[in-house]
Amino acid sequence: MMQETLFALCDPTRREILKMLKKGSKTAGEIAERFDISPPAISRHLSILKDAELVETRREGKFVVYELICEPLDELDDWLRNMMKENL
């Protein structure tokens, strides 16, 4: 799963989306408003984040709401910290 996490994090737009979601859940429309890219591009970014299990979705009426999942980021952080300890 770490490979998917790293792939998702390599894009600055996806990192910015994660920063937004760190402050709280957002609808796809609220996320899209923040960026000057096409709706299909935003949808693709959100799909990659979901595939990497960095976000989860739920329906609220006609809206899809995205929420940050911190566990994959915590796992990556732990791995990086352990890697640094081993190399020092």
Regions found by a protein language model. Give the residues of each.
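Short capping segments at the starts of secondary-structure elements
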Residues: 12, 23-27
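Amphipathic alpha-helical dimerization/coiled-coil segments
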Residues: 1, 19, 69-88
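Alpha-helical residues within the helix-turn-helix
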Residues: 33, 44, 50-51
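Pre-recognition alpha-helix immediately N-terminal to the DNA-recognition helix
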Residues: 15-17
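Beta-hairpin "wing" of winged helix-turn-helix
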Residues: 50-60, 67
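Helix-turn-helix DNA-binding motif, specifically the short coil turn and the N-cap/start of the second
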Residues: 27, 38-41
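Residues within the alpha-helical elements of helix-turn-helix
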Residues: 20, 34
